[in-house]
UniProtKB/Swiss-Prot annotation:
A zinc finger (RING-type) spans 776-815. This is E3 ubiquitin-protein ligase bre-1. E3 ubiquitin-protein ligase that mediates monoubiquitination of 'Lys-117' of histone H2B. H2B 'Lys-117' ubiquitination gives a specific tag for epigenetic transcriptional activation and is also prerequisite for histone H3 'Lys-4' and 'Lys-79' methylation. Involved in regulating stem cell proliferative fate. GO terms for cellular component: HULC complex; membrane; nucleus. The gene is rfp-1. The lineage of its organism: Eukaryota, Metazoa, Ecdysozoa, Nematoda, Chromadorea. PROSITE patterns: ZF_RING_1, ZF_RING_2. It comes from the Eukaryota. It holds the Pfam family zf-C3HC4. SUPFAM superfamilies: RING/U-box. Residues 269-298 have a biased composition (Low complexity).
Length: 828
């Protein structure tokens, strides 16, 4: 018989739906084959259908309750994730507020009392703010930072004014002829020595802070890499968990189906046992409708195996869920460690180093950059929150799409199984009807048109061909989807490796070395300068070639990967188009199948009506035969005995054939299920081996990465030690050159003093030497009014600007490089 399952919205029946709405009808109507024993009346038929419908409804209610419990667990997990995200947001906000308090405290400790705005709100208050309140709070924070930096700049300006006053006082003392010049020189030397000591101390502290920041940045990158690996592992585990859910749901449906069949078989067996005392004709009709045999041992073993497989799948799903929870806890602990490291980096720098680390000139230049950096960080925080919300929405949409796809595949599989069952049911019903037709033809000489049987055979053949085409199309679509997924995963891995290579590569910008011409003081200095330029030229040439080679390799790799991405995008578009066409064809095929099913239903209804008419005619003939039997009782009794014996023999033969057919069908079904179970077990074993191989490959890559990081650290330490040795040698050489120059000047001065005859000539010579010290050594005409902040050599501003504009950005005395922010004007 046919069972109609109405799952419309609001309890609407299928009869109320319009006849032309095929899509809605296909969604609401579902056919399922159910084997029932023979019945004596219409009421018994209705009662059996109601019982079967109630069993099916119980199955659906069980499945829906399990789905509801799964969705509730997912909701709780999503709530926990939301709480972790909110806690991370509060941690980030608290870090920013502590940074602002630290800046305020530093400005207050160094420069006295500062007018401060009200204290910043807590993280929970910020979480409950509106967008306008949050923007106003950000503006006030920016104003607080601006006031702090203004006060810091004012203090630095006061310090520079004090130094300027000191220099002016020295000028006045130098202009006074009564004062001794040696005392002034001693004061200047002491002041210069103190400043140089302070500068050396600041440089050492800056180097230390930079090295610490570099180490912390490396640790942060390492933690980020670990985090990305764990996220990918979580995604893989989620996919495996979804597959396990799908398999458990499938096995649960099969188990419910087999349990319902067992119940029906037991009911049929009990019904046959109670009806054994009835008439022989009714008993033969019941046996023709259903053999009523209890379930065999093979079917019970199959059901037990399916139940054990279902329990195993549930245990695997529980273990995987526990692993996911463990990884989530590890991620939370890692996030807490990262926040602690950030707090340690912010609190490790002492206040004395911050207060004495920079001068007024550098602070004035970098003030605008600090404000822009703060704004950028605020924008980045907003972008991160927006991106987090977008990722959540994308993930939810993706989960919905995946659930819809799973539902579609389940419906397609159910539809195929229903077609398969209807095919077997129709074949069995056709054989039973053929036997009934032969018996009725022998008794009452009734015939059925051969055209109806031909039409039913044609429909069965069409259903078989449609089933084969649908299976081939489904296999083709699955193969295409697997190929596209493999290509997509390969492209992702290649992009990830390229990004890692770009992050690990170090690009060192090099400046062109310019040839500087200086006056040869003596023969030794000229030879030394020429050798130094030659060595520097050779070193710069090698570095440039290496840099060019690296740039070419990187550009080539990027171009290759971009082309591969374009080709993959095109293939993906082609695959989506093919999938759309296949889905359209599948919908057309489904519509045709539904039309054929409706036609078959109409034919079955007509056949039932014909059978009812035949039964009525049979009853009338029986009454007539009873009236006539009074006249010829003996003859009819003998004839009836002969006929009943022949009928019993035929019925026994038919029962044997039916039992053989049922046994063959059960064996075929068992073979099909066993082959499917073996195939699933093989697939699970292959996937398990693949996951193990991937885990081994991941461990090997991790070992390689650790080894490369250790080698990189060794090379960095070696490079730092060598660079420090080179800088110390360079500094010693510069000091020796300066001492040599001072000795030469003293020697020339002593020589000139010996040659001078009177005291006036001595004073003139001293004045001339003082003018030479105050004039620019490059142009010999203009006074010294500009200082190099790296080497502290004095020149005129015009000479330094011409050197900067002509790209000869090296100090004429020590050949040290300088930039736009490395020279400043002074007043002597």
């Amino acid at each position: 018989m046919m069972k109609r399952n109405n799952e419309g919205i609001g309890g609407e029946g299928v009869a109320n739906s319009p006849p032309d709405d095929t899509q809605q009808k296909r969604r609401r109507i579902q056919f399922e084959a159910v084997k029932m024993p023979a019945v004596q009346s219409v009421t018994e038929l209705r009662s059996r259908t109601v019982a079967i419908q109630a069993a099916k409804l119980r199955q659906t209610v069980l499945i829906k309750n399990k789905r509801i419990s799964d969705l509730e667990r997912e909701n709780e997990r999503a709530k926990r994730r939301q709480l972790t995200d909110e806690s991370n947001f509060l941690k980030v906000y608290n870090l920013f507020s502590e940074l602002e308090k630290f800046i305020w405290a530093q400005t207050k400790d160094e420069f006295g009392e500062v007018k401060m705005t009200p204290s910043a709100p807590a993280g929970t208050d910020v979480q409950g703010m509106t967008s306008e309140q949050y923007h106003s709070f950000v503006d006030t924070a920016k104003g607080n930072l601006r006031i702090a930096f203004n006060s810091y700049a004012k203090a630095r300006h006061d310090r520079t004014t004090e130094t300027a006053n000191f220099i002016a006082r020295l000028k006045t003392l130098m202009a006074d002829p009564k004062l001794n010049i040696n005392d002034i020189h001693k004061e200047l030397a002491a002041k210069t020595a103190s400043l140089l000591a302070q500068i050396d101390k600041l440089q050492a502290e800056a180097h230390r802070v930079q090295s610490e920041n570099h180490n912390l940045e490396r640790k942060r990158r390492h933690m980020v890499d670990k985090n990305t690996l764990l996220e990918s592992r979580i995604q893989e585990m989620e996919k495996l968990l979804e597959e396990a859910h799908f398999e458990t749901e499938k096995q649960m449906r099969l188990a419910c189906k087999y349990e319902a069949r067992l119940i029906l078989e037991h009911e049929a067996a009990s019904g046959n046992a109670t009806a054994s005392s009835s008439a022989t004709l009714n008993q033969s009709e019941k046996k023709m409708g259903s053999p009523g045999s209890p379930p065999s041992e093979s079917t019970s073993r199959e059901i037990e195996a399916l139940r054990a497989d279902r329990d195993e799948q549930a245990a695997i799903a529980a273990r995987r869920l526990q692993e996911l929870e463990d990884t989530n806890r590890k991620l939370q602990s890692m996030a807490q460690d990262i926040s602690k490291l950030k707090m340690e980096t912010q609190s490790s720098v002492p206040s004395d180093v911050i207060t004495n680390s920079e001068e007024y000139r550098n602070l004035k230049k970098y003030y605008s950059l600090a404000i822009k950096e703060h704004e950028r960080i605020c924008k980045d925080l907003e972008d991160v929150t927006v991106e987090r919300d977008q990722l959540r929405s994308v993930k939810e949409n993706r989960e919905k799409m995946m659930s819809e796809e799973h539902q579609k595949t389940i419906k397609e599989i159910q539809h195929q199984s229903e077609i398969h069952n209807t095919f077997y049911r129709v074949s069995h019903d056709s054989e039973v009807l053929r036997a009934e037709f032969e018996t009725v033809k022998e008794e009452y000489n009734k015939t059925v048109k051969q055209s109806e049987w031909d039409e039913m055979k044609a429909t069965v053949n069409t259903l078989r061909s449609l089933n084969k085409t649908m299976k081939s199309q489904m296999q083709r679509m699955k193969d295409r989807e697997k190929a596209s997924q493999k290509e997509h995963s390969a492209v992702k891995t290649e992009l990830k490796t390229l990004k890692d290579q770009l992050e690990k590569s170090v690009l060192v910008p090099l400046e062109d070395s310019g040839n500087t011409s200086t006056e040869d003081a003596n023969k030794i200095r000229a030879e030394y300068e020429s050798l130094k330029r030659e060595i520097r030229r050779i070193g710069a040439m090698d570095k440039q070639e290496k840099q060019r080679q690296l740039d070419r390799e990187i550009q080539r790799h990027i171009a290759d990967k971009v082309t591969e991405l374009e080709t993959l995008r095109k293939t993906n578009e082609a695959l989506t188009n093919d999938e759309q066409t296949l889905s359209d064809e599948l919908e057309v095929v489904c519509l045709t199948i539904e039309e054929e099913q409706e036609r078959n239903a109409q034919l079955f209804m007509e056949k039932r009506d014909q059978e009812d008419r035949n039964l009525k005619m049979m009853n009338e003939r029986m009454i007539q035969n009873q009236v006539q039997s009074r006249m010829r009782e003996k003859l009819e009794c003998l004839e009836s005995k002969a006929q009943t014996d022949a009928q019993i023999a035929k019925m026994h033969e038919f029962e044997k054939k039916a039992s053989d057919e049922v046994l063959n069908k059960l064996t075929e079904n068992l073979q099909f299920k066993t082959s499917e179970v073996t195939r699933l077990s093989n697939m699970m074993e292959v996937h398990r081996k693949q996951t193990q191989e991937l885990g081994f490959a991941r461990d090997e890559n991790q070992v390689k990465v650790d080894r490369c990081e250790a080698q990189l650290k060794q090379y960095q330490d070696l490079y730092g030690s060598k660079s420090r040795e080179v800088e110390e040698a360079k500094f010693k050489r510069q000091r020796a050159e300066e001492e040599l120059e001072l000795v030469r000047v003293k020697y020339e001065r002593a020589k000139r003093n010996d040659s001078a005859q009177t005291g006036d000539q001595v004073l003139q010579e001293a004045n001339r030497q003082m003018k030479e010290t105050l004039t620019c050594p490059s142009c010999k005409t203009r006074p010294k009014d500009c200082i190099m902040l790296k080497c502290y050599h004095l020149f005129c501003e015009t000479c330094i600007k011409t050197m900067y504009d002509t790209r000869q950005r090296k100090c004429p005395k020590c050949n040290s490089n300088f930039g736009a922010n490395d020279f400043h004007r002074i007043f002597i």
